[in-house]
Amino acid sequence: MKNYYSVLNECAVKNQVLFAGSTFAHDFPINELMQDFDVDARVYNRSEKGAKLADARDFVMEQAEALEPSKIFLCFGDEDIKAEGFLAGEFSYEYKELVSDIKKKFPDCQI
């Protein structure tokens, strides 16, 4: 996964919101919705087009370590489900493992 976010993360405000996912999340109009609903938080979209959950674990953890968010929204699965040989049980297990890893490293973070 790309790491061009590292420069942006140096300027980011800690204790805000991390939004991480794949194509759907990458294209999601977060800023527009924040304005429409007067959200008083900074949301950092660190999503990658084409990302699959299995490839994203290290990337998500890296972004969380850099941003130290108070909340994390995960939005993976849109690319996984299209992949040949997709197994729902395996995907569910990997998702739970990612959430568990985040909770261990960032116990005060809401997911």
Model-derived features with residue positions:
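Conserved SGNH/GDSL esterase-like catalytic core that processes O-acyl groups on lipids
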Residues: 1-96
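Active-site segments of SGNH/GDSL-like serine hydrolases
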Residues: 75-81, 103-111
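Hydrophobic positions in alpha-helices of CheY-like receiver
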Residues: 98-102
